[in-house]
Amino acid sequence: MPGLPLDSTVPNGIRFDSFGGPMTNRTIGYIVGSISSTSINRRLAKALERLAPEGTTLVEIPIKDLPFYSVDHDADFPQVAVDFKQAIADVNGVIIVTPEYSRSIPGVLKNALDWAARPYGQNAFNLKPTAVIGTSGSGIGTAAAQQHLKAILSHFNAPTLGQPEGYVQSTPGLFGEDGEVTNDETAGFLTGYLEAFGDLIDRYAEVPAGV
């Protein structure tokens, strides 16, 4: 990955262990790419929050109050957008939980990402560990949306969790409103997903200044 210290003795030349050991406490922000009151992806996000391992806290970074982005705002950023970018800065990593609309991400999520990237040169996702997950009734739930989203995050220079991929097939009653997961296999997958993302966060916990 560009900018990281290199070591020819490890695969791909990337030396992660120089960034410090596992963090004892992590705060992970999550963005739900839907503003629907009945969103199953919001229930998935609540499940992740409920399943967070010891020492990890998940907090929502809301997007519903962001206005439509326009370059006209760059000279005078609205406070809601300032707060949104600060919320991203304040967490150790971000999980984006996205539905799939018309084989891509919802407009409300794209709008939030545009705010995060502006003004030019002040991208809130630069070197921010990020993970993508989503659920739908399909066996490859939200796969097309996630590919588009990962392309955006790559442009943002955001280290993004590669494996496991978060394609969760939703069935009636799988997620309760409070985040309860009724299927043990799904709960186990989500727990492993959070652990893998925690490992990614740890690798970037002490990236040298200026990287």
Walk through the language-model features, giving the residues of each.
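Helix-loop-strand module that forms the ligand-binding subsite of alpha/beta enzymes
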Residues: 76-157
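N-terminal beta-loop-helix "entrance" segment that forms/cooperates
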Residues: 63-80
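Glycine-rich phosphate/pyrophosphate-binding loop and the adjoining helix
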Residues: 23-24, 29, 159-211
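Secondary-structure boundary/capping motif
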Residues: 37-40, 69, 104-105, 141-142
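Short, Lys/Arg-enriched N-terminal segments with co-localized hydrophobic residues
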Residues: 8-22
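N-terminal beta1-alpha1 ligand-phosphate binding loop
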Residues: 24-55
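A generic structural motif
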Residues: 53-59, 158-160
